[in-house]
Every structure is written in C-alpha cells, then in structure tokens.
C-alpha cells in the first residue's frame, strides 16, 4: 500500500492554519496552488459529505467525493477521498500542533493500493508538496489577525 506523508512548519498559530485549511472560501486558493478545486458542501463536521470540484482532465471527471470522518478543531481533520467512480476509497488526515511558536502541519493521504495506487500516490504527492510549500504559505501570508483575507 502506498501513502503520502508531508510535514511542514508554519509561523502562524494553529487556529490561523486551521482556518486556512477548513474555510471553503480559502481552500481553492491553496489547493493545487490556486488552481485547485472548490470544496462544495464542506463543513468541518463529522458526517458532512462534500466534493472537491475542479476542471476535468483526460481520464478524470474533475470531482472527488469526500466525507468528513473525524474533527477535533483545531488539531485534526480526517476525511475519505474517492477520486473516480468505483475507485479506491482513500483517507486524508490533517494534524496540526503548536510547534516552535507556530504550527506543525502533518498531511497524510493513505489507502492507495496496487500499481495504479502507487502511481496515483506519486502524482498526488508531488502536487500536495507544492500546495503545502507554495500555496498554503501564500494564503497564510494574506490573512489578517482576525483570519480574514487582506484586500
């Protein structure tokens, strides 16, 4: 089984990082570095079903079906991820903890199986690393002290 695990430290409070990764208006700004999908129907509440909706590409319909499985604000978000009809159901986990005056963010995406899962994990791993090293820091830098976007 293949998996993605990425750890980043950000110089912002866990509440600020939590807001950036759970506010439906902010999510498309950092996922896939601004070209990511909007999180239709997302709520940080266990049982909430939502979809990441992006521009379709050859071989992909542009929709990921998800369900929030566990929430412990502001330290844990866990949700299922199904990228294709009939495809494997994988799991995404965000863990946030105070660290060195900021936040340590751990991203995990697990449950990829077979050779197709191996290649999907490699592809998504590359995209996620860019999102968390470029996209999310840019959004965090644009938030004011109250968590709103600076205009």
Predicted regions and their residues:
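A short small-residue
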Residues: 1-3, 108-115
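Hydrophobic ligand-binding cavity/cleft-lining segments
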Residues: 1-38
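Hydrophobic/basic alpha-helical segments enriched in Actinobacteria
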Residues: 5-6, 15, 23, 40, ...
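Hydrophobic-ligand binding "helix-grip"
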Residues: 28, 41, 51, 55-101, ...
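A conserved amphipathic terminal alpha-helix motif
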Residues: 111-151
